[in-house]
Amino acid sequence: MSRYRGPRFKKIRRLGALPGLTSKRPRAGSDPRNQELSGNKSQYRIRLEEKQKLRFHYGLTERQLLKYVRIAGKAKGPTGQVLLQLLEMRLDNILFRLGMASTIPQARQLVNHRHILVNGRIVDIPSYRCKPRDIITAKDDQKSKAMIQNSLESPPHEEVPKHLTFHPFQYKGLVNQIIDSEWVGLKINELLVVEYYSRQTKT
Protein backbone atom coordinates (compact mmCIF):
# COMPACT_ATOMS: atom_id res chain seq x y z
CA MET A 1 0.00 0.00 0.00
CA SER A 2 1.43 3.39 -1.00
CA ARG A 3 1.90 6.45 1.17
CA TYR A 4 -1.30 8.49 1.59
CA ARG A 5 -1.52 11.59 -0.64
CA GLY A 6 -5.27 12.25 -0.51
CA PRO A 7 -7.30 14.95 1.29
CA ARG A 8 -5.79 15.48 4.72
CA PHE A 9 -8.77 17.06 6.44
CA LYS A 10 -10.82 13.97 5.60
CA LYS A 11 -8.39 11.88 7.65
CA ILE A 12 -8.35 14.12 10.71
CA ARG A 13 -12.15 14.27 10.74
CA ARG A 14 -12.19 10.48 11.00
CA LEU A 15 -9.13 9.82 13.16
CA GLY A 16 -8.59 13.04 15.11
CA ALA A 17 -5.58 15.37 15.08
CA LEU A 18 -2.61 14.11 13.05
CA PRO A 19 0.00 16.87 13.50
CA GLY A 20 2.61 15.08 11.42
CA LEU A 21 0.26 14.99 8.42
CA THR A 22 -1.25 18.47 8.68
CA SER A 23 -1.23 21.42 11.04
CA LYS A 24 -5.02 21.64 10.71
CA ARG A 25 -7.12 20.40 13.60
CA PRO A 26 -10.63 18.92 13.55
CA ARG A 27 -13.33 21.35 14.63
CA ALA A 28 -14.46 21.17 18.24
CA GLY A 29 -16.90 18.32 18.58
CA SER A 30 -15.87 16.70 15.28
CA ASP A 31 -13.26 14.41 16.83
CA PRO A 32 -14.66 10.90 16.28
CA ARG A 33 -13.50 9.86 19.71
CA ASN A 34 -16.02 12.32 21.13
CA GLN A 35 -18.79 11.23 18.78
CA GLU A 36 -18.63 7.49 19.25
CA LEU A 37 -18.23 5.45 22.38
CA SER A 38 -15.67 2.70 22.11
CA GLY A 39 -18.37 0.20 23.03
CA ASN A 40 -20.13 0.92 19.73
CA LYS A 41 -17.09 -0.18 17.72
CA SER A 42 -15.70 -3.63 17.15
CA GLN A 43 -12.34 -4.36 18.74
CA TYR A 44 -10.91 -4.83 15.25
CA ARG A 45 -12.05 -1.36 14.19
CA ILE A 46 -10.60 0.24 17.33
CA ARG A 47 -7.22 -1.37 16.65
CA LEU A 48 -7.42 -0.52 12.95
CA GLU A 49 -8.04 3.17 13.66
CA GLU A 50 -5.09 3.37 16.06
CA LYS A 51 -2.90 1.74 13.42
CA GLN A 52 -4.14 4.19 10.78
CA LYS A 53 -3.45 7.14 13.07
CA LEU A 54 0.14 5.99 13.48
CA ARG A 55 0.61 5.36 9.76
CA PHE A 56 -0.83 8.67 8.56
CA HIS A 57 0.87 10.76 11.27
CA TYR A 58 4.33 9.43 10.43
CA GLY A 59 3.63 9.20 6.68
CA LEU A 60 4.43 5.51 6.30
CA THR A 61 3.32 2.86 3.88
CA GLU A 62 1.67 -0.26 5.28
CA ARG A 63 4.81 -2.27 4.53
CA GLN A 64 7.06 0.24 6.28
CA LEU A 65 4.95 0.26 9.44
CA LEU A 66 4.81 -3.54 9.55
CA LYS A 67 8.60 -3.64 9.21
CA TYR A 68 8.96 -1.30 12.20
CA VAL A 69 6.56 -3.43 14.25
CA ARG A 70 8.64 -6.52 13.51
CA ILE A 71 11.89 -4.76 14.46
CA ALA A 72 10.31 -3.51 17.69
CA GLY A 73 9.07 -7.01 18.50
CA LYS A 74 12.62 -8.38 18.39
CA ALA A 75 14.12 -5.58 20.49
CA LYS A 76 14.44 -5.41 24.26
CA GLY A 77 11.65 -3.61 26.08
CA PRO A 78 7.89 -3.25 25.54
CA THR A 79 7.15 -3.58 21.82
CA GLY A 80 4.80 -0.58 21.70
CA GLN A 81 7.26 1.78 23.36
CA VAL A 82 10.14 0.59 21.19
CA LEU A 83 7.96 1.09 18.10
CA LEU A 84 7.25 4.71 19.01
CA GLN A 85 10.93 5.33 19.72
CA LEU A 86 11.90 3.96 16.30
CA LEU A 87 9.38 6.20 14.56
CA GLU A 88 10.19 9.28 16.61
CA MET A 89 13.93 8.97 15.93
CA ARG A 90 13.50 9.01 12.14
CA LEU A 91 15.22 12.02 10.59
CA ASP A 92 12.05 13.34 8.94
CA ASN A 93 10.22 13.24 12.26
CA ILE A 94 13.12 14.87 14.13
CA LEU A 95 13.04 17.79 11.67
CA PHE A 96 9.30 18.12 12.25
CA ARG A 97 9.66 18.01 16.04
CA LEU A 98 12.41 20.64 15.90
CA GLY A 99 10.10 22.95 13.93
CA MET A 100 12.37 22.94 10.87
CA ALA A 101 9.41 21.61 8.85
CA SER A 102 5.69 22.24 9.36
CA THR A 103 4.71 18.63 8.63
CA ILE A 104 6.48 15.31 8.21
CA PRO A 105 5.83 15.24 4.42
CA GLN A 106 7.52 18.65 4.22
CA ALA A 107 10.43 17.34 6.29
CA ARG A 108 10.72 14.38 3.94
CA GLN A 109 11.03 16.76 0.99
CA LEU A 110 13.83 18.67 2.72
CA VAL A 111 15.73 15.43 3.19
CA ASN A 112 15.03 14.04 -0.28
CA HIS A 113 16.20 17.28 -1.91
CA ARG A 114 19.46 17.21 0.06
CA HIS A 115 18.88 20.29 2.21
CA ILE A 116 19.79 18.56 5.50
CA LEU A 117 23.09 17.54 7.06
CA VAL A 118 23.64 15.15 9.96
CA ASN A 119 27.00 15.56 11.66
CA GLY A 120 28.25 17.64 8.74
CA ARG A 121 27.27 15.21 5.98
CA ILE A 122 24.27 15.41 3.67
CA VAL A 123 21.70 12.71 4.44
CA ASP A 124 18.98 12.15 1.85
CA ILE A 125 17.21 9.21 3.52
CA PRO A 126 14.10 10.32 5.48
CA SER A 127 14.07 7.08 7.50
CA TYR A 128 17.64 7.64 8.73
CA ARG A 129 17.64 6.71 12.42
CA CYS A 130 18.99 9.55 14.52
CA LYS A 131 20.87 8.82 17.71
CA PRO A 132 22.01 10.75 20.78
CA ARG A 133 24.62 13.45 20.03
CA ASP A 134 23.62 13.77 16.38
CA ILE A 135 23.81 17.35 15.09
CA ILE A 136 21.22 18.23 12.44
CA THR A 137 21.72 21.37 10.36
CA ALA A 138 20.45 23.03 7.20
CA LYS A 139 22.78 23.05 4.23
CA ASP A 140 24.67 26.33 4.11
CA ASP A 141 22.86 27.91 1.20
CA GLN A 142 20.14 30.53 0.91
CA LYS A 143 17.43 28.23 -0.47
CA SER A 144 17.78 25.61 2.26
CA LYS A 145 17.70 28.17 5.05
CA ALA A 146 14.80 30.07 3.49
CA MET A 147 12.65 26.93 3.36
CA ILE A 148 13.31 26.20 7.02
CA GLN A 149 12.76 29.84 8.00
CA ASN A 150 9.30 29.70 6.40
CA SER A 151 8.43 26.76 8.61
CA LEU A 152 9.77 28.49 11.72
CA GLU A 153 7.55 31.49 11.00
CA SER A 154 4.43 29.41 10.32
CA PRO A 155 2.08 28.77 13.27
CA PRO A 156 1.25 26.77 15.25
CA HIS A 157 4.54 26.32 17.10
CA GLU A 158 4.78 23.17 19.17
CA GLU A 159 7.13 22.97 22.13
CA VAL A 160 10.42 21.28 21.26
CA PRO A 161 10.51 18.02 23.24
CA LYS A 162 13.12 17.56 25.94
CA HIS A 163 15.15 14.97 24.05
CA LEU A 164 15.96 17.65 21.44
CA THR A 165 17.54 21.11 21.48
CA PHE A 166 17.07 23.66 18.70
CA HIS A 167 19.15 26.75 17.90
CA PRO A 168 16.99 28.70 15.42
CA PHE A 169 19.57 31.32 14.43
CA GLN A 170 22.02 28.59 13.49
CA TYR A 171 19.36 26.34 11.90
CA LYS A 172 20.77 23.60 14.08
CA GLY A 173 19.18 20.86 16.15
CA LEU A 174 20.76 18.48 18.64
CA VAL A 175 19.58 15.03 19.66
CA ASN A 176 20.17 14.83 23.40
CA GLN A 177 18.81 11.35 24.09
CA ILE A 178 16.37 8.67 22.94
CA ILE A 179 12.85 10.02 23.29
CA ASP A 180 10.83 9.24 26.40
CA SER A 181 7.29 8.01 25.74
CA GLU A 182 5.71 11.08 27.38
CA TRP A 183 7.20 13.30 24.66
CA VAL A 184 5.77 11.41 21.69
CA GLY A 185 3.99 13.91 19.45
CA LEU A 186 0.77 11.93 18.95
CA LYS A 187 -1.99 10.75 21.26
CA ILE A 188 -1.91 7.05 20.53
CA ASN A 189 -2.48 3.71 22.23
CA GLU A 190 0.52 1.91 20.78
CA LEU A 191 -0.49 -1.40 22.38
CA LEU A 192 -3.56 -1.53 20.12
CA VAL A 193 -1.29 -1.11 17.09
CA VAL A 194 0.87 -4.02 18.24
CA GLU A 195 -2.25 -6.13 18.78
CA TYR A 196 -3.47 -5.29 15.27
CA TYR A 197 -0.25 -6.61 13.75
CA SER A 198 0.14 -9.57 16.12
CA ARG A 199 -0.91 -12.14 13.50
CA GLN A 200 1.29 -10.71 10.74
CA THR A 201 4.38 -10.58 12.97
CA LYS A 202 4.02 -14.28 13.78
CA THR A 203 4.07 -15.35 10.15
UniProtKB/Swiss-Prot annotation:
GO MF: rRNA binding; structural constituent of ribosome
GO BP annotations listed: ribosomal small subunit biogenesis; translation
All residue ranges annotated as the S4 RNA-binding domain in the record: 89-150
Top-level taxonomic group: Eukaryota
InterPro entries, per database record: Ribosomal_uS4, Ribosomal_uS4_bac-type, Ribosomal_uS4_CS, Ribosomal_uS4_N, S4_RNA-bd, S4_RNA-bd_sf
Key word rRNA-binding present: yes
Location in the cell: Plastid, Chloroplast
UniProt entry keywords in alphabetical sequence: Chloroplast, Plastid, Ribonucleoprotein, Ribosomal protein, RNA-binding, rRNA-binding
Region listing for Disordered, in residue ranges: 15-42
Predominant location category: plastid
Disulfide bonds listed in the record: none
Pfam families: Ribosomal_S4 (PF00163), S4 (PF01479)
Cellular component GO terms held in the UniProt record: chloroplast; small ribosomal subunit
Statement: the UniProt record of this protein carries the keyword Manganese: no
Job description of the protein: One of the primary rRNA binding proteins, it binds directly to 16S rRNA where it nucleates assembly of the body of the 30S subunit.
Family: Belongs to the universal ribosomal protein uS4 family.
Subunit structure: Part of the 30S ribosomal subunit. Contacts protein S5. The interaction surface between S4 and S5 is involved in control of translational fidelity.
PANTHER family, alphabetized: 30S 40S RIBOSOMAL PROTEIN, SMALL RIBOSOMAL SUBUNIT PROTEIN US4M
The protein's name in its UniProt record: Small ribosomal subunit protein uS4c
Organism the protein comes from: Oenothera elata subsp. hookeri
